[in-house]
Amino acid sequence: MPNRGVVLLDGQALAYNIEKDLKNKIQIITAQTHKRPKLAVILVGKDPASITYVNMKIKACQRVGMDFDLKTLKENITEAELLSLIKDYNTDQNISGILVQLPLPRSIDTKMILEAIDPNKDVDGFHPLNIGKLCTQKESFLPATPMGVMRLLEHYHIEIKGKDVAIIGASNIIGKPLSMLMLNAGASVSVCHILTKDISFYTKNADIVCVGVGKPDLIKASMLKKGAVVVDIGINHLNDGRIVGDVDFINAQKIAGFITPVPKGVGPMTIVSLLENTLIAFEKQQRKGF
């Protein structure tokens, strides 16, 4: 029997409400300035998952009235060509934010590409300058997924200060920035990765468990503390057509106090956080007369 007291962290519903607010703000801004925020999206290659994610972001832009410029590039594009495009976007006053859909082909140096983006247009929050500001608690663009996770927890009034948090996955995109946000919020944070000997040691003692590594059913119910907050950031496409996370959701909800579903949990919050960052970038650029 499912835990009747478990609360589903409904990212889709929250994202919908945030989108409504964004749409209203953009309408007001457009009426006042006759300008709209504009997101530049760069897609390299034909990876099915990347195409799906880009389409979701474009549709979200359309829903809130945000302009976008999509560049779909062949997989054999050179680094020099890609850098040239980013340079053009950096200097284009009509572009508020720049997003390079990851992963890039192996032939391209992802780190170099991300570092080429103007930090003031880095709405994904991946530029070293923005990551450094995050670590030192200075105002910066936060990576969209960690930002969405924190917003979701805040919405459900989940206390972070003084809590033990286990983060499974140490990527630059999710695990590392999320650990800094949790630390900045007053949590004691343990980050587990591929070399961690016993993940369950950390998860069993954690008040909040966040996982995003791309392995279905990695986190079992037996690995959780009763009443824990479980944030499933994983997205896995199974052969039978189902989309699942990294947590054994059916059994974990019998133990957890709060849990995100997959889909409709963290995913929608990631996209709406990207839109929020783009609007923030636009407003900053307008204040500077850019």
Swiss-Prot record:
InterPro entries assigned to the protein according to its UniProt record, in alphabetical order: Aminoacid_DH-like_N_sf, NAD(P)-bd_dom_sf, THF_DH/CycHdrlase, THF_DH/CycHdrlase_cat_dom, THF_DH/CycHdrlase_CS, THF_DH/CycHdrlase_NAD-bd_dom
Record bears the keyword Oxidoreductase: yes
Pathway(s) annotated for this protein in UniProt: One-carbon metabolism; tetrahydrofolate interconversion
PROSITE patterns: THF_DHG_CYH_1, THF_DHG_CYH_2
A biological-process GO annotation: purine nucleotide biosynthetic process
Signal sequence annotation: none
Annotated keywords: Amino-acid biosynthesis, Histidine biosynthesis, Hydrolase, Methionine biosynthesis, Multifunctional enzyme, NADP, One-carbon metabolism, Oxidoreductase, Purine biosynthesis
EC numbers: 1.5.1.5, 3.5.4.9
Residues noted as binding NADP(+) in the record, renumbered to the chain: G169, A170, S171, I194, I235
GO molecular function: methenyltetrahydrofolate cyclohydrolase activity; methylenetetrahydrofolate dehydrogenase (NADP+) activity
Catalytic activity: (6R)-5,10-methylene-5,6,7,8-tetrahydrofolate + NADP(+) = (6R)-5,10-methenyltetrahydrofolate + NADPH; (6R)-5,10-methenyltetrahydrofolate + H2O = (6R)-10-formyltetrahydrofolate + H(+)
GO cellular component assignments: cytosol
PANTHER family: C-1-TETRAHYDROFOLATE SYNTHASE, CYTOPLASMIC, C-1-TETRAHYDROFOLATE SYNTHASE, CYTOPLASMIC-RELATED
Membership in a protein family: Belongs to the tetrahydrofolate dehydrogenase/cyclohydrolase family.
Function comment: Catalyzes the oxidation of 5,10-methylenetetrahydrofolate to 5,10-methenyltetrahydrofolate and then the hydrolysis of 5,10-methenyltetrahydrofolate to 10-formyltetrahydrofolate.
HAMAP family on file: THF_DHG_CYH
Subunit-level organization: Homodimer.
Name of this chain's protein: Bifunctional protein FolD
Source species of the chain: Helicobacter pylori (strain J99 / ATCC 700824) (Campylobacter pylori J99)
Recorded name of the encoding gene: folD
